[in-house]
A protein has these predicted regions:
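N-terminal leader/linker segments that precede catalytic domains of diphosphate-processing enzymes
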Residues: 1-185
C-alpha cells in the first residue's frame, strides 16, 4: 500500500516547572485512528510543496529545515520535500489546534488579536490546504519553521488500511496563543 508523507507537531509549554505536551482526541466517526489521542498533524497537501508555499518561508529559515531530514534508508530528503513537511506541520497546527506558527515580514510573531481574527478560516483550510498559503500571502506572513525541532520519524503499522510516513516536530506554543481544538477531526 502507498504511504503518504505526513507531518505532526508536539506543541510544548512549561507550566509550573512541568513540561506539557498537547494531545487532541480524534472524533469517534473518523475513518483513521477514530477516538484516539494524537498530536496535531496530517498528510502533506499539494499546496505545501508549491513554489508559493516556499515563497512564504523566511529565507533565513530555509537552512534550518533543509538537510536535517532523511529517509528510512538514511538518504537526505530533497530540500523541496523537507520544506513541504515543515509547511504542512505549520498548516496542520493552525487547522487542528488554532495555533498559527507564522511571523510578519519584520520577524515578529502574530499578535493574539490577529490570530483570533484568522480563526474562522480554519475550516476552509481543512477543506483546501491551498487556502493556508493564500492566507499567508494575504496577511504577508511567513511560516515560522525555524523553531520547529525535528523529533522522530514513524511509519504507520502495516495492519492499518491507511499508512503514513510521518515526521514529528516539536515547538513551544508561541507566547500569547491559546489552543482551540478543531471539533470536526
Amino acid at each position: 500500500r502507498l504511504m503518504r508523507a505526513a507531518a505532526t507537531v508536539l506543541l510544548l509549554r512549561e507550566l509550573e516547572s512541568e513540561l506539557e505536551v498537547l494531545m487532541m482526541r480524534r472524533g469517534a466517526g473518523l475513518a483513521f485512528m477514530a477516538d484516539m489521542w494524537v498530536f496535531p498533524g496530517g498528510r502533506i497537501d499539494v499546496a505545501d510543496a508549491s513554489a508559493a508555499a516556499r515563497a512564504r518561508v523566511a529565507p533565513e529559515a530555509l537552512a534550518s529545515c533543509c538537510g536535517q531530514l532523511h529517509s528510512l534508508h538514511g538518504e537526505r530528503l530533497a530540500d523541496d520535500d523537507a520544506i513541504a513537511l515543515h509547511v504542512a506541520a505549520c498548516r496542520e497546527t493552525f487547522e487542528e489546534a488554532g495555533v498559527l506558527l507564522a511571523r510578519d515580514r519584520a520577524g515578529r510573531p502574530c499578535s493574539p488579536d490577529r490570530v483570533a481574527a484568522l480563526q474562522p478560516l480554519r475550516g476552509e483550510i481543512e477543506r483546501d490546504g491551498g487556502r493556508f498559503i493564500a492566507l499567508l500571502e494575504a496577511e504577508d506572513l511567513y511560516v515560522d519553521i525555524g523553531p520547529l525541532v525535528y523529533w522522530s520519524h514513524w511509519i504507520t503499522p502495516s495492519i492499518e488500511p491507511k499508512r503514513y510516513d510521518t515526521r514529528f516536530f516539536a515547538i513551544p506554543v508561541p507566547p500569547d496563543q491559546a489552543v482551540s481544538a478543531d471539533l470536526s477531526e
